[in-house]
C-alpha cells in the first residue's frame, strides 16, 4: 500500500512513476481513505487503508518499490502532504487557552519540583543525611528523575488511546502521596521509597498528558503555547525554594514539605479539570485481554522509532541536554555554599535562574514559531548553555558577581530545553503518535539520567573546588553533545541549508 501521512478526503493526484526498467508514465489516480478507528486525534484517518485507484480499478502498490514519486493535489491547493492538517487545530480560542492554563497549573508542581531539587538536596545533606556521602545522596535524586522519565512510557500509549483524565487522576494521587510521605523520611531508603519511587512515578504519569493535551489544540502556535504552559515549571522553581527556605526555619522540614504537598495537590486538581484533549480518541475495542497486553507492550517501547535518524538524534540530544540541566540545577546551591556564599544567597540563585527561565521559555518559543524554527532555536540555546558553562562557571565560579551573571544567563539559555523538546518531537511526528514518541524519548532519557547524578556526586566527592570543576566539565560536555545531536537531526531533515526549521 502507498502510505500517505494525511489525506483528509478523496483527492486527485498526478503520480510520476519511475521503477526498474519501465519508462516514466503519468498516472491520473484517485486516493481514497476508508473511515476506521484510529489511536489518536485524526479519528477518521487510517494511513494503512489508503488505496490507489486507476480507471475505477484498485491498484495495489508497494511503497518500497516506488522511486522518484512526485505528487500534487489538483484543484485543492490548500491540501498538503504533511503530518497534520492545520485546519483541524484551533490554534487559539478560549477553550484552547484554558487547556494551556490547566497545563501551566499542573506543571507548576511537576516541573517546578524538578527545578527545586537543589532546595531539598542542600537541606537533607546537612540534616537528616549529614553523615551520608554525596554520591549516596545523589541516588535519591537520580532515581527520582529516572523514574519520572521512565514512567512516561506507561502514560504515552494510554494517552494516545484513552485521553488524559485517567492519567491525571492516577498521577495526582501517587504524586501527592509520595510528597506527603517525604515529610516523615529520615533515612536514605525512606527517601528513595517516598520521593524517588512514589513522587517520581506520579511525575512521569502526569508529564505526558499535561504536555500532550496542549499539542492537540495547537499546531502553528504549538511552540509558544507549550512554552507558556511550561512556564509553570519556572514559577514553581521560583516559589518553592524561597518558600521552603522560609518554612524550614519557621515550622521545620516536616510541615514545610506538607505545606508544599497541599499546594501541589491544589494545582494538580485544577489541571485535571482544565487540561483536556481537543477530541476524544476514536478507537477499536480490544477483543481479548491478550490483545490489550500486546498493544500496551508495543506502545510502551517502539524500537522502530529509533530507526528514523532524525528521531534517534533528537532523543539522544534531549537526553544529554536535560540530564545536564537537572544535574547542574541539583548541585548549584551546594556549589554556591562551597564557594563561600550563604545559604540565603545559594537558594536565591536557584530562584533567580528559574525567574530568568520564564523569559527563556517565552522568548525562544515566540521566535521559534514566528521566525527561526524550533530546531534552530533549540540548537542555539543548548549551545549557549554549554558555552556559559565553559567560559563563565568553570573559570570564574569563585567570583560572586560572575556567578550571579552565569546563573541568569544559564537560566535563560536552558529555559527552552524543557519547553521546546516536546515541540521538536511533535514537529517530526504525527499528533496521533505524539504520546508514544514523547514517552519513548523519556525512556531513553531515564536510562541516561540514572548514572549521570551518581557520576556527578562521585566527581564532587568531598566537595572541594577542584572536584566541582571536574563536575562542571562533565556536565558541560553533556550539554555540548546534546547540541551536536540536534544539529545532526536537523541535517537529516533539511540538510545544511539555512532555513526556518
UniProtKB/Swiss-Prot annotation:
Cross-link (Glycyl lysine isopeptide (Lys-Gly) (interchain with G-Cter in ubiquitin)): 54
Any Gene Ontology CC annotation: cell periphery
Glycosylation sites noted in the Swiss-Prot or TrEMBL record: 131
Pfam families, A to Z: MFS_1 (PF07690)
Membrane topology: Multi-pass membrane protein
Annotated localization: Membrane
Superkingdom, taxonomy of origin: Eukaryota
InterPro entries per UniProt: MFS (IPR011701), MFS_dom (IPR020846), MFS_trans_sf (IPR036259), Proton-linked_MCT (IPR050327)
Chief location category: membrane
This protein's name: Probable transporter MCH4
Organism: Saccharomyces cerevisiae (strain ATCC 204508 / S288c)
Gene: MCH4
